[in-house]
Regions:
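Generic beta-strand/beta-sheet core signal
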Residues: 14, 123-125, 153, 178, ...
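Helical "lid/coupling" subdomains associated with nucleotide-phosphate turnover
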Residues: 224, 259-326
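Short acidic loop-to-helix transition motifs that present clustered carboxylates
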Residues: 153-161, 322
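Short flexible coil/turn linkers enriched for glycine and charged/polar residues
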Residues: 3-4, 14-16, 26, 39-40, ...
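Phosphate-binding loop and its immediate beta->loop->alpha context
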Residues: 17-154, 201, 210-257, 263-265
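Alpha-helix capping and helix-loop boundary segments enriched in small/acidic/polar residues
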Residues: 127, 175-176, 205-213, 239, ...
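Gly/Thr-rich phosphate-binding beta-strand-loop-beta motif of the actin/hexokinase/Hsp70
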Residues: 2-31, 166-201, 252, 257
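Generic structural signal for well-ordered alpha-helical scaffold segments
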Residues: 101-110, 161-165, 294-305
Length: 326
């Protein structure tokens, strides 16, 4: 009997979404792992049932519309705690994170005839303490991964190594990683070492700045438009049911993503009173998000200054929010 084919996976457990790459079954080439029918991302959200069963990703979001008290949208934000209170119950944080890892690994196994990966690489923020990294390892253990198969690496180092595989970075030179995700912004300046690895020489970040910040700015803009055009609908929207707000959140995210490629987009507000469509142009979007972008630029300049490098240092942009044109 032939031994099972070896395969490897790397998982980026994010604040809002998680992603993964694996070695393809047929070629062994490193490829992005599809995590749903429509995306290479999976929401990092989890839903805890009354019986303790934990769902992750899109199913967690769906269940959370019916009972928001049992939804944890961003388990990563609880790093540093051992327990998270969900609907009056204390739930181990490693179980919540483990549920997300399990969801990702199941999709990987489905691509590899149900076999477990030979190695698993887990990324984490540069600023995490040993205790925080141990929590990630503990979460991996809850889904049956043995410690000797797991490697951890900081997110900026992983990004720099990926960038260096595409662009030559001479030893001793620097590269900046601008990681603008759904929930956080992290900037690091790294120096290329002789052995091909990278060391972080400066880092800045904001754990409250991300794609959701921009979503909130757009929500306030929509509310202003509704109040101007239909005050009664605005009052209704402020106390709307979860399903109404979810629909609006989705429309806002879709419009934000469309503005990366088009000069305008429509945000739809659907309530029992009817539908309202609001057109937003890219110029309006840029004006609305000017403070967010300004803060991101400020942090980037601070990181470059701290590292003692100039503006000619290459910047590798990663994270979904980095795709937004500014």
């Amino acid at each position: 009997m032939n031994a099972p084919a070896q395969w490897h996976i790397a998982v980026d457990f994010g604040t809002s979404n998680s992603a993964a790459a694996h070695t393809a079954p047929m070629t062994g080439a490193v490829e992005t792992l599809p995590l749903s029918h429509r995306s290479n991302l999976i929401p990092s959200a989890v839903f805890v049932q009354a019986d303790g069963a934990i769902h992750c990703g899109d199913s967690a979001i769906s269940l959370g519309r019916r009972d928001p008290s049992r939804l944890v949208p961003a388990p990563k934000r609880y790093i540093g705690h051992d327990q998270v209170q969900v609907a009056g119950q204390d739930v181990p944080l490693n179980a919540l994170i483990g549920a997300v890892l399990y969801g990702v690994l199941e999709r990987g196994r489905a691509q590899h005839s149900g076999e477990n990966p030979t190695t698993v690489t887990l990324t984490h923020p540069e600023s995490w303490s040993v205790h925080n990294v141990d929590m990630l390892l503990s979460a991996a253990a809850t889904v049956g991964l043995s410690k000797d198969t797991i490697r951890t690496i900081s997110e900026p180092r992983a990004a720099a190594i990926h960038y260096a595989a595409q662009q030559h970075i001479p030893a001793g030179s620097h590269v900046a990683v601008f990681d603008f995700g759904g929930g956080t912004l992290d900037i690091a300046v790294l120096r290329a070492e002789q052995n091909g690895d990278f060391s972080v020489v400066a880092a800045k970040g904001d754990n409250t700045l991300g794609g959701r910040t921009i979503d909130n700015v757009l929500y306030r803009w929509v509310l202003d438009q509704v109040e101007h055009n239909d005050p009664d609908t605005a009052d209704e929207l402020k106390s709307a049911e979860v399903s109404v707000m979810h629909s609006l959140d989705q429309s806002i995210r879709e419009a934000k993503e469309m503005l990366s490629d088009t000069s305008s987009a429509t945000i739809t507000v659907s309530t029992p009173r009817g539908e309202h469509d609001f057109l937003i142009t890219r110029d309006e979007f840029n004006t609305l998000t000017d403070k967010v972008v300004g803060r991101a630029v400020e942090l980037t300049q601070a990181a470059l200054s701290q590292a003692g490098v100039d503006k000619s240092t290459p910047i590798y942009m990663t994270g979904g929010s980095s795709r937004i044109p500014y």
